[in-house]
Curated annotation (Swiss-Prot):
Gene from which this protein is expressed: TAF1L
Motif Nuclear localization signal per UniProt: ranges: 1370-1377
Record note on quaternary structure: Can bind directly to TATA-box binding protein (TBP). Interacts (via bromo domains) with acetylated lysine residues on the N-terminus of histone H1.4, H2A, H2B, H3 and H4 (in vitro).
Similarity comment: Belongs to the TAF1 family.
PROSITE patterns, alphabetized: BROMODOMAIN_1, BROMODOMAIN_2
GO biological process, one term: regulation of transcription by RNA polymerase II
Keyword flag DNA-binding: yes
Composition-biased stretches (Polar residues): 1660-1700, 1787-1797
Residue ranges, compositional bias (Basic and acidic residues): 1252-1268, 1817-1826
PANTHER family: TRANSCRIPTION INITIATION FACTOR TFIID, TRANSCRIPTION INITIATION FACTOR TFIID SUBUNIT 1-LIKE
Cleavable signal peptide: none
Keyword terms: Bromodomain, Cell cycle, DNA-binding, Nucleus, Repeat, Transcription, Transcription regulation
Effect listed in the UniProt record for changing residue 762 to I: In a lung adenocarcinoma sample; somatic mutation
Entry protein name: Transcription initiation factor TFIID subunit 1-like
Length: 1826
């Protein structure tokens, strides 16, 4: 219904209510009883105002109810009935019975069914809430003196109806009121232009209105005002002037016309809703009062009189526009102005001097405008129209209105009413209403009506598809075409635009001049074709418009679901068209891009060079024929029995070592390489080169039992190390012993590499497979067996090869590729035979070929031979095949190209797999390769074993890598069988139903029409559901209804899949999109890839003894197969029962038909009549109605009608009825009924069992985990047991009753196998009881899910694993060194004892971690091992602000966060404080924590000396040597302050002589910051003055070379200023250090004079280098591993005891060093004769003592050096860090008061350099400068 009609109905309903209420009021007043309006709340009210009938209220309640009149309810009736006789509707409108008399054209709405929402209640409530203005003449009347005042105070009533007026005013009021004929006020018809042209003056309703003299003009103005200002009657005079009229707010408003809401509230208009918050429900008497109030207000507006009312408003003057900021909404809604147009309202702005150009001037009609001479700005162009004169407008309007009024009066109707233009009034649609389908059944549907409506739903055509089929439209396969509406597209300009204003009614009297329109094309207009659409091929028209439209409509809900984390946010893919190629780009770059459609990205070079025998397919390595026995032993050959040679004879045989042979062979090859000119040389040229007796040897163990592709002997492969860089700064790939490093961005495997991950892989032309390096056990070795004897050699490394990624497709049996390979292989063999022939012309025999290819027929061989040779029957070449004289034999390269070794390997793999299938019982037809067209159907039908055949797996993998399909990933083709490998089985790209039972989809057949139907879910309930799901309120408000429903459905489905959704009824089946399906596929591939890497790289030794019996395994496998077959046809019990019933019905029908045919022979006449009846029933198409009488439980009979429409059933029924008697039919029916009853009972019994099972499962869920029953104590101790710990009888050492069980020195016992309780817990975690799909009961069958069987196997496998402690294993026997000469390979080469030194921070951390382990071993310390669980102890973290535990302590230690003992002990002490705070100081847990602290103090005290040395090495400021601290501060000044100056980079390093060749000619003493840092590291500066001299030299050099005004000089000046400023900050500290250094130097010199000569050091009279006593040389000894140079020849002598000669020597040793990462202390290397041995460089032999002259002998070893040595049991990889600051020796330490920083990393120790005495003459000049 239209909105206008809706308003008329509401108005009529309101008038009816008002009239009825008036009549009631009259009756009530005549009744004379006290009227209690509140009684309507409890029932009907009588005429006396009392409750009718037997009320539920007693007298006391009625008194209370009457007392509610004090709330003002009574005054409402009194106010309404006070002036009822003055309303103007007299007795003329009332009939004899007191009801309102109906008019002649009244319509009866009593039986109307449509319920319209009552919008008028909101308006009435707002009108009633406004405070009325009372008048003196009404106040003087006394209606109810007692209670009126109280009522008015408590609840002010609405204003009463208008009072009595003067005689002349009564006429106006009557015309205003009764113009519509009734008591309702309807505005008169006045044109809006007339209303807008008049200035209406309104005044409020005042007391003295009776004295005003009315005039016609004022009456008209008042009438206009009340039409356009509906609230003017209750507003003050001043306020009404500020109010806009209705026509200003709503230009489409027409007084007296039906409201067009579509025009009033157009799209985009935001009209304030005044009544939005008002309550909706009001009683009818309240509506009546408010309706009359509106009438009174609208009729009582007097515009001429302007007298002051009781209220006065003082308004401030309106602010000027420049002080008001425009509202954002107004700014947004304002129309966008043309860039050429200029605002006319801006008077203050100076008009632009540029000429304005009209938009339409230079458009499509420019030619015509030019011909007419129209100016550029378009001024003066009016089309020749003329404006109408405004002074005659009222006269013309009044004349027109008079003419229309007369015409309407003559016709009796309103001809121009909007209703007359509607199609519903112009068409006789009532004639097309179908009241009864039987009446028009013979007519059929009208085609013209159906075509107008698109399609009409009927019994036969319920939807468009059925209608199209009926109309003869063939259904197309192109379902992806965009959907178009069957209705025409609305023209928005016609629907929403004001086009009627542009109609030219009179060209000489235009209301306004029209401006030429501007043509604007809307690209979104579907009626416009702006470009020629692309033609799409009919076969491949997969248009994504359907999905894109769906995606765009769900965009908001998808964004919200992504925010809440239900679905993963995917980056939006740009589906736009590819970019058009630039015509000027002539580079043809696209032809040089790497091909994307290739199978593998060739990371690095992939050229594989096989050996020559492999390339030429030599006979033993590439056999031409293999029998069944050889094929079964494919790549597993047994040991041969030799017929001759040393091993052919029995007896003992010696085993020869190969060490000398390997060295000899390597030397020979090196000589050959040198002789050929160096470079790389290919040595694999003969079969002898392929032996394993020389060269390097590794083993590779394949993890697959039968790999899809295997290399033959002599084929090459590469080891590639795939590395994926880390984002940001990447340290580079770690070094590997084997292989070449390849940096890859995309992974070459099914799973992707993680950033920073390196994975080694075997790669060749056949496959790519990940490999995992493992250390060979020392007890393993290799025996090589030849005819001559046995040879033994060591094995170093072994690789485990993961699952292969095939790169070469294996041909299927009897496929075209396989047959072509056989043909080519034979042809190549023939060619090579000809090449080997020494005869001329070349000739070969047929027997040689038949011997090599015994399976080939002679005819096929002859066919190959005829291409190149002729068979000679006579002559010298009789019985030979001679090469044709005109045939050119292919060269070796051509032959190699014809058949490659890879093709042979693929063929061998095919025949080996074919033989395995044959042995398994599969026939030839079961594994034939399918044709390409039927491949999809074929894949669904073949067996699992055939699925795993290599021709299927390789084809599937290669197709998946090309993007043609996906892989099953987990399934039958998994080579591991336990889910740790990929199953290369094809599945389509689009998601399908999974075969296995892991995620069963529930049958959603009962959704439509139930409470689970999302269409019936109200918006309020849907939003409440979203709140339960945790969606924020602001996000919910942004969504529309269907977006909310979409989010509910998606989140319910997600929670139902995860098994935690409470609202699972709204969940839907997981119909994934293709993108979601691909995402799940990638995640599954990544999971299996990571699992495979983890399993195959693990060094854990698994036990193979599982005590399993093969019979049990076979039983389990058979059971699993049966269960899988049962699960393939998934049917519920109801479906099975329906099938049984259907089978029995068919059986009964067959029996009846057989019986009927048997009886037909006896009664031929009946048969004839039956056939005639059936013929008649079949021919006429009538239906058969069978009336069956039933009896219910109470014994009453009722009849059901059953209609049969199928002719066959009708014939059978009629035949039975005519041929059989009643007893026979009842007997069969009773049998059928009995059987059905038994089936019902059986079904009920099974359903009851299921309900009981579910109930028990729910009880177990609520009950929680079962409590462990305490084990019963044995009454007697078992006297056979004797404890191994305490020696007592009756228990074991692992029993808790042993008194020594809790002692700390006893190692904690480890369980060998799982206990029964642990197995039960594992079953609960693995097998979930809440999964109802694991066990199904279908009918009388119990179906187990596949997941259940797998979980049982998992529990069984884990329970059979045995764990043995390492201490209880027998010690390995050490291998004795052989004494024979040939066992030289057993001689272990001499290892240098220069072991690696680790970072002191790592050493300290390892000591602290050992202390933590000791504390963990203390008894009863378990509560402190891990952080406190906040769920168990809820208030712990409210009381304890700094929690700490041993696990957190261990993590901090491993992160190297404790550079000193104090910080470690402080955190440990925090555990004690926390326990005392929470538990109390006397609590047992506090005592335990105190014992942990005591143990820590004891351990720290034991290692105090070692820890002190390590702390000094970590933090140089803690060192005893003041020189170290002084140099540390200076280095920090250089690195952190001076180098941080902006644009100071030219001074960081020496000037490059290549770039600035004349610099060193001008600058004699160059210096730079790097040189200063090197001097600092050499301790060259013992005072600030020497340091500042070098810093000032930088500035002086820059001034000298660049000039004082240069930018470089300014930067140098800034560096010097920063240096002076920083030194001033550390002035006090540096001054003290300088004094200490000077004091130590003087003390050392004095003591050196008194000290006697030491034999290990040069004496004072020994000749020394000239500047040995240079003051710049350091006098101190360092123990800082991260600060100094290599001090391997320094001792641990203190400064006080060191001689000056030693100090000078040590300082001299630093002068030549340039590295900043240094060793800490000297070595303790002594040869057997006791002489100290100089250190060897890294990797050297340690024999430099005789080769170097002037080396200094080493003092005794340093204690700290021994602390930092890595022992054999420690990990060697912990000091792999690197100095991030380049060569900054102090980068790891920051200046602070405590002198330590726990968050910094420490650089590694660089390898030690050989120490040499160096003379400083000319070698130690100042560095370069700027």
């Amino acid at each position: 219904m239209r909105p206008g009609c809706d308003l008329l109905l509401r108005a009529a309903a309101t008038v009816t209510a008002a009239i009825m209420s008036d009549s009631d009021s009259e009756e009530d007043s005549s009744g004379g009883g006290p009227f209690t309006l509140a009684g309507i709340l409890f029932g009907n009210i009588s005429g006396a105002g009392q409750l009718e009938g037997e009320s539920v209220l007693d007298d006391e309640c009625k008194k209370h109810l009457a007392g509610l009149g004090a709330l003002g309810l009574g005054s409402l009736i009194t106010e309404l009935t006070a002036n009822e006789e003055l309303t103007g509707t007299g007795g003329a409108l009332v009939n004899d019975e007191g009801w309102i008399r109906s008019t002649e054209d009244a319509v009866d709405y009593s039986d109307i069914n449509e319920v319209a929402e009552d919008e008028s209640q909101r308006h009435q409530q707002t009108m009633g809430s406004l405070q009325p203005l009372y008048h003196s003449d009404y106040d003087e009347d006394d209606y109810d003196a007692d209670c009126e005042d109280i009522d008015c105070k408590l609840m002010p009533p609405p204003p009463p109806p208008p009072g009595p007026m003067k005689k002349d005013k009564d006429q106006d009021a009557i015309t205003c009121v009764s113009e519509s004929g009734e008591d309702i006020i309807l505005p008169s018809i006045i044109a809006p232009s007339f209303l807008a042209s008049e200035k209406v003056d309104f005044s409020s309703y005042s007391d003295s209105e009776s004295e005003m003299g009315p005039q016609e003009a004022t009456q008209a103005e008042s009438e206009d005002g009340k039409l356009t200002l509906p609230l003017a009657g209750i507003m003050q005079h001043d306020a009404t002037k500020l109010l806009p009229s209705v026509t200003e707010l709503f230009p489409e408003f027409r007084p007296g016309k039906v409201l067009r809401f579509l025009h009033l509230f157009g799209p985009g208009k935001n009209v304030p809703s005044v009544w939005r918050s008002a309550r909706r429900k009001r009683k009818k008497h309240r509506e009546l009062i408010q309706e009359e109030q509106i009438q009174e207000v609208e009729c009582s507006v007097e515009s001429e009189v302007s007298q002051k009312s009781l209220w006065n408003y003082d308004y401030a003057p309106p602010p000027p526009p420049e002080q008001c900021l425009a509202d954002d909404e107004i700014t947004m809604m304002v129309p966008v102005e043309s860039k050429f147009s200029q605002s006319t309202g801006d008077v203050d702005k100076v008009t632009d001097t540029k000429p304005r150009v009209a938009e339409w001037r230079y458009g499509p009609a420019r030619l015509w405008y030019d011909m007419l001479g129209v100016s550029e700005d378009g001024s003066g162009f009016d089309y020749g129209f003329k404006l109408r004169k405004t002074q005659h407008e009222p006269v013309i309007k009044s004349r027109m209105m008079e003419e229309f009024r007369k015409l309407e009066e003559s016709n009796g109707t309103d001809l121009l009413a909007d209703e007359n233009f509607l199609m519903v009034t112009q068409l006789h649609w009532e004639d097309s209403i179908i009241w009864d389908g039987e009446d028009i059944k013979h007519k059929g549907t009208k085609p013209q009506g159906a075509s107008l409506a698109g399609w009409l739903p009927s019994i036969k055509t319920r939807n468009v598809m059925a209608y199209n089929v009926q109309q003869g439209f063939a259904p197309t396969l192109d379902d992806d075409k965009p959907w178009y509406s069957i209705f025409p597209i609305d023209n928005e300009d016609l629907v929403y635009g004001r086009w009627e204003d542009n109609i030219i009614w009179d060209a000489q009297a235009m209301p306004r001049l029209l401006e030429p329109p501007v043509l604007a094309l809307d690209p979104n207009d579907e009626n416009l074709i702006l470009e020629i659409p692309d033609e799409k091929e009919e076969a491949t028209s997969n248009s994504p418009s359907k999905e894109s439209k769906k995606e765009s409509s769900l965009k908001k809900s998808r964004i919200l679901l992504g925010k809440t984390g239900v679905i993963r946010e995917e980056p939006q893919q740009n589906m736009s068209q590819p970019e058009v190629k630039d015509p000027w780009n002539l580079s043809n770059d696209e032809y040089y891009f790497p091909k994307q459609q290739g199978l593998r990205g060739t990371f690095g070079g992939n050229i594989i060079q096989h050996s020559i025998p492999a390339m030429e397919l030599w006979q033993p390595f590439f056999p031409t024929h293999m029998g069944p026995i050889k094929i079964r032993q494919f790549h597993r050959p047994p040991l041969k029995k030799y017929s001759f040679g040393a091993l052919s004879q029995p007896g003992p045989h010696s085993v020869q070592p190969l060490l000398k042979h390997i060295k000899k062979k390597a030397k020979m090859r090196e000589q050959e390489r040198q002789a050929s000119g160096g470079g790389e040389l290919f040595f694999m040229r003969t079969p002898q080169d392929l032996t394993g007796k020389d060269g390097d040897l590794i083993l590779a163990e394949y993890s697959e039992e039968n790999g899809p592709l295997m290399m033959q002997v002599g084929m090459a492969t590469k080891i590639k190390n795939y590395y994926k860089r880390k984002p940001g700064k990447d340290p580079g790939a770690p070094d590997c012993k084997y292989g070449e490093t390849v940096y890859c961005h995309t992974s070459p495997f099914l799973g992707s590499l993680h950033p920073g991950q390196l994975l080694q892989a075997l790669e060749n032309n056949l496959f790519r497979a990940p490999v995992y390096l493992h250390k060979m056990p020392e007890t393993d070795f290799l025996i090589i067996r030849t005819r001559q004897g046995y040879y033994i050699r060591e094995l170093v490394d072994i690789f485990v090869v993961g699952q292969q990624c095939p790169l070469f497709e294996v041909p299927g049996p009897n496929s075209r590729r396989a047959n072509m390979h056989i043909r080519d292989f034979l042809q190549v063999f023939i060619y090579r035979l000809f090449w080997k022939s020494k005869d001329r012309p070349r000739r070969i025999r047929m027997e040689d070929i038949k011997k090599a290819f015994p399976s080939h027929s002679e005819s096929s061989i002859r066919k190959r031979l005829k291409l190149c040779a002729d068979f000679k029957r006579t002559g010298m070449d009789s019985n030979w095949w001679v090469l044709k004289s005109d045939f050119r034999l292919p060269t070796e390269e051509e032959i190699r190209a014809k058949v490659s070794p890879e093709q042979c390997c693929a063929y061998y793999s095919m025949i080996a797999a074919k033989q395995r299938l044959k042995d398994a019982g599969y026939g030839e037809k079961s594994f034939f390769a399918p044709e390409e067209e039927n491949e999809e159907d074929f894949q669904m039908k073949i067996d699992d074993e055939v699925h795993a055949a290599p021709w299927n797996t390789t084809r599937a993998f290669i197709a998946a890598m090309k993007g043609k399909c996906l892989l099953e990933v987990t399934g039958v083709a998994d080579p591991t069988g336990c889910g740790e490998g990929f199953s290369y089985v094809k599945i389509p790209n689009k998601p399908t139903q999974q075969k296995d039972d892991k995620e069963p989809q529930a049958v959603k057949k009962t959704v439509t029409g139930t409470d689970a139907d999302l269409r019936r879910l109200s918006l309020k309930n849907a939003k409440q559901l979203l709140r339960k799901f945790g969606v924020p309120e602001e996000e919910i408000k942004k969504l529309s209804r269907w977006e909310v429903i979409d989010v509910v459905r998606t989140m319910s489905t997600e929670q139902a899949h995860s098994g935690e959704g409470p609202m699972s009824k709204f969940a839907r089946g997981s119909r994934f999109s293709v993108a979601e399906h691909q995402e799940r596929y990638k995640e599954e591939c990544q999971r299996i890839f990571d699992l495979q890497n983890k399993v195959l790289s693990s060094t854990e030794v698994l036990s193979t003894d599982t005590d399993s019996i093969s019979a049990e395994d076979s039983d389990f496998e058979e059971m699993g197969k049966n269960i899988e077959n049962m699960l393939q046809n998934k049917k519920t019990s109801s479906q099975l029962s329906r099938e049984w019933e259907e089978q029995e019905r068919k059986e009964l029908r067959r029996m009846l038909l057989v019986a009927g045919s048997a009886a037909s022979g006896n009664n031929h006449r009946d048969d004839v009549t039956a056939s005639m009846t059936s013929l008649k029933s079949s021919a006429t198409g009538h239906c058969l109605k069978i009336y069956r009488t039933f009896r219910d439980e109470e014994g009453k009979e009722y009849v059901r009608c059953e209609t049969v429409r199928k002719p066959a059933v009708i014939d059978a029924y009629v035949r039975i009825r005519t041929t059989k008697d009643e007893k026979f039919i009842q007997k069969f029916a009773l049998f059928d009924e009995k059987h059905r009853e038994e089936m019902r009972k059986e079904r009920r019994r099974i359903q009851e069992q299921l309900r009981r099972l579910k109930r028990n499962q729910e009880k177990e869920k609520l009950k929680g985990p079962p409590e462990k029953k305490p084990k019963k104590m044995k009454e007697r101790p078992d006297l056979k047991l004797k404890c191994g710990a305490c020696g007592a009888i009756g228990h074991m050492r692992t029993n808790k009753f042993c008194p020594l069980y809790y002692q700390t020195n006893v190692p904690p016992s480890k369980p060998v196998a799982m206990t029964e309780e642990q197995e039960e817990e594992l079953e609960k975690t693995v097998i979930h009881n809440d999964n109802e799909e694991l066990i199904k009961v279908e009918g009388t069958k119990i179906v187990f899910g596949k997941q259940l069987i797998e979980n049982v196997h998992e529990v069984r496998r884990k329970s059979l694993v045995l764990k043995f402690p390492k201490q209880q294993l027998p010690p390995k026997k050490k291998r004795r060194v052989g004494t024979t000469v040939h066992c030289d390979y057993l001689n272990i080469p001499h290892k240098s004892i220069h072991r690696r030194r680790t970072d002191p921070m790592v050493t300290l951390s390892s000591i602290l971690e050992s202390i933590i382990n000791d504390m963990r071993d203390l008894p009863n310390t378990h509560p402190f091992h891990t952080p406190v669980n906040a769920k168990v102890v809820k208030d712990y973290y409210k009381i304890i602000t700094r929690p700490m535990d041993l696990q957190t302590l261990r993590e901090n230690v491993r992160k190297c966060l404790y550079p000193s003992r104090e910080e470690f002990r402080e955190h440990l002490e925090l555990i004690v404080k926390n326990s005392a705070t929470y538990n109390g100081p006397k609590h047992s847990l506090t005592q335990i924590s105190q014992s942990m602290l005591d143990l820590c103090d004891e351990k720290l005290k034991e290692k105090e000396d070692k820890l002190a040395r390590l702390e000094k090495a970590i933090n140089p400021l803690l060192d005893d040597d003041d020189q170290v601290a002084f140099s540390f501060i200076l280095d920090n000044i250089v690195t952190q302050k001076m180098m941080a100056v902006p644009d100071s980079w030219p001074f960081h390093h020496p000037v490059n002589k290549k770039f600035v060749p004349d610099y060193y000619k001008m600058i004699v003493n160059p210096v730079d910051l790097e040189t200063i840092r090197k001097n600092i590291s050499k301790h060259k500066y013992q005072s600030r003055e020497s340091f500042l001299d070098d810093v000032n030299l930088i500035l002086a050099n820059s001034v000298k070379y660049n000039g004082p005004e240069s930018q470089y000089t300014k930067t140098a000046q800034e560096i010097v200023n920063i240096c002076y400023q920083t030194i001033t900050e550390y002035d006090e500290h540096l001054t003290q250090l300088e004094k200490d250094i000077c004091t130590a130097k003087e003390a050392a010199l004095e003591e050196a004079e008194l000290e006697s000569l030491d034999p290990m050091t040069p004496g004072p009279y020994t000749s020394q280098p000239p500047d040995m006593y240079d003051t710049n040389t350091s006098l101190s000894t360092s123990r800082d591993a991260s600060v100094f140079q290599d001090e391997s020849n320094l001792s641990v002598l203190d400064i006080s005891t060191a001689t000056p000669e030693k100090q000078m020597c040590q300082g001299q040793g630093r002068l030549g060093e340039e590295d900043s990462d240094v060793d800490v202390e000297g070595y303790d290397d002594e040869e057997e004769d006791g002489k100290p041995k100089p250190p060897a460089p890294e990797g050297g032999d340690g024999d430099l003592a005789d080769e170097e002259e002037g080396t200094v002998q080493q003092p005794e070893a340093s204690v700290l050096y021994e602390d930092l040595l890595i022992s054999e049991g420690e990990d060697d990889e912990e000091d792999a860090g690197s100095d991030e600051e380049g060569d900054n020796p102090f980068s790891a330490i920051q200046l602070s008061e405590s002198g330590s920083d726990s968050d910094v990393g420490y650089g590694g120790i660089r390898p030690k350099q050989p120490f040499m005495l160096q003379h400083a003459s000319g070698e130690h000049k100042d560095g370069h400068g700027k």
